[in-house]
């Protein structure tokens, strides 16, 4: 990645982009080989370790001289201060073709997906609602990717400030080899770093096919899975499971959910049960980053992070939102072994948009 004084090349198009947010910990210091006090600069694409007075590129590990040389310049805070040239630079290329998304996919997503902030409107290849992005130059487009024979909607908010990352969907089905229309000439290693940052910052679930990233940045391992009814938000205790967050796979028409549980009977740190977690913690937060910032949940370190996999290459849309598994009207939810009360129906029912 080329660097120039006073300018940091973005992951995508070579112009300044808000990418990683405010001082996200998790980059390894090349001197100590550990986390040290390494932090990622605010609105920068370089990491620095104040303890060792060293700055490096977190993608390829190349050590650089002065950190101040390569900080991405801040954009004006208000849209009125942004010129037409700035907006032109920040506007991503337009996708020429819009895939035909089956209406059943959007209907199921509206009805059964636990939207962040209680509301998210799918927009079929158009921009997101204007209220979410006050500046049109920073409003990304939806990205659709083919997964086997199915078309799955995926949002990559690469061109938006981190404050909008909570709008990411809960599950991202991603095949790096099929992102060429959006991420042109981007090495897999850089995509891998981007996916890790999104996962670390937003808690989004990134489901990737096995062996799709042939780099050594991650050491993928197929994590064990446990079966459970997803509406009660609880998982059996699995002491050997080290994968952070949730792995949500589908096979034989049955949702298979796995995730780390702090203690036997306690709720797993899964996004599908986020309403239940927030209810128990008596907070109005709608995003796992709130729990992460308050030390209520923990993610594994950089090298022990496992990417998420799907056992098969084809995920039919009917399996993404299984009405039988999502419908808890026919029976009362069972009390978990730990005695915690499962969330009520209202936590998992979304009103029609």
Curated annotation (Swiss-Prot):
Q: Which gene encodes it?
A: Tax
Start and end residues of each stretch annotated as Disordered? 326-353
Q: Where is the composition biased (Basic and acidic residues)?
A: 343-353
In which residues does the motif SH3-binding occur? 73-80
Q: What GO MF terms are annotated? A: DNA binding; SH3 domain binding; zinc ion binding
- Return the similarity comment: Belongs to the deltaretrovirus Tax protein family.
Q: What does this protein do?
A: Transcriptional activator that governs the viral transcription from the 5'LTR via the recruitment of dimers of host phosphorylated CREB1. Together they bind cAMP response elements within the viral promoter and mediate high-level viral transcription. Increases host CREB1 O-GlcNAcylation to further increase 5'LTR transactivation. Modulates also the expression of cellular genes leading to the deregulation of T-cell proliferation, perturbing the integrity of cell cycle checkpoints, the DNA damage response and apopototic pathways.
> Which compartment or compartments is the protein found in?
Host nucleus; Host cytoplasm
Q: How does it assemble?
A: Homodimer. Interacts with host CREB1. Interacts with host DLG1, IKBKG, KDM4A, MAGII3 and TAX1BP1. Recruits the coactivators CREBBP, EP300 and PCAF. Interaction with human CARM1 enhances Tax transactivation and promotes methylation of histone H3. Interacts with host SUV39H1 protein, leading to abrogate Tax transactivation of HTLV-1 LTR. Interaction with human CREB coactivators, CRTC1/TORC1, CRTC2/TORC2 and CRTC3/TORC3 enhances Tax transactivation. Interacts with host UPF1; this interaction inhibits the host nonsense-mediated mRNA decay (NMD).
Which segments carry the region annotation Transactivation? Answer: 289-322
Q: What is the effect of changing residue 215 to D?
A: Almost complete loss of CREB and NF-kappa-B activation
Q: Tell me the protein's name.
A: Protein Tax-1
| Annotated spans, Interaction with CREBBP C-terminus | 312-319
Highest taxon of the source? Viruses
Where is the stretch described as Interaction with CREBBP/P300? 81-95
Organism, scientific name: Human T-cell leukemia virus 1 (strain Japan ATK-1 subtype A) (HTLV-1)
Q: Where along the sequence does the record place the motif called PDZ-binding?
A: 350-353
């Amino acid at each position: 990645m080329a660097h120039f004084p006073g300018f940091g090349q973005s992951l995508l198009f070579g112009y300044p982009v808000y990418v990683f947010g405010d001082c996200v910990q998790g980059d390894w210091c090349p001197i100590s080989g550990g986390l040290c006090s390494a932090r990622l600069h605010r609105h920068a694409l370089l990491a620095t370790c104040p303890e060792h007075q060293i700055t490096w590129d977190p993608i390829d590990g190349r050590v650089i001289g002065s950190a101040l040389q390569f900080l991405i310049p801040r954009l004006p805070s208000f849209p009125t201060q942004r010129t037409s040239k700035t907006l032109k630079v920040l506007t991503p290329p337009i996708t020429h073709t819009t895939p035909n998304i089956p209406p059943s996919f959007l209907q199921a997503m509206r009805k059964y997906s636990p939207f962040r902030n209680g509301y998210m409107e799918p927009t079929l290849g158009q921009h997101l609602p204007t209220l979410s992005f006050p500046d049109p130059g920073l409003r990304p487009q939806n990205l659709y990717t083919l997964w086997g024979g199915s078309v799955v909607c995926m949002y990559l908010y690469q061109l938006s400030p981190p404050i909008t990352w909570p709008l990411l969907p809960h599950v991202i089905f991603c095949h790096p080899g099929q992102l060429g229309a959006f991420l042109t000439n981007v090495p897999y290693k850089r995509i891998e770093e981007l996916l890790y940052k999104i996962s670390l910052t937003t808690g989004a679930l990134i489901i990737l096919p096995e062996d799709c990233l042939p780099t050594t940045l991650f050491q993928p391992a197929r994590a064990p899975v446990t079966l459970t009814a997803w509406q009660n938000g609880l998982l059996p205790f699995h002491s050997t499971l080290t994968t952070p967050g949730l792995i949500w796979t589908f096979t034989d028409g049955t949702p298979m959910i796995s995730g780390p549980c702090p203690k036997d009977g306690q709720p797993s740190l899964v996004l599908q049960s986020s309403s239940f977690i927030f209810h128990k913690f008596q907070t109005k937060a709608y995003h796992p980053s709130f729990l992460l910032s308050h030390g209520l949940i923990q993610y594994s370190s950089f090298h022990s992070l496992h990417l998420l996999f799907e056992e098969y290459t084809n995920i039919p849309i009917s399996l993404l939102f299984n009405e039988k598994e999502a419908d808890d009207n026919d029976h009362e939810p069972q009390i978990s072994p730990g005695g915690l009360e499962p969330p009520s129906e209202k936590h998992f029912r979304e009103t029609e948009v």
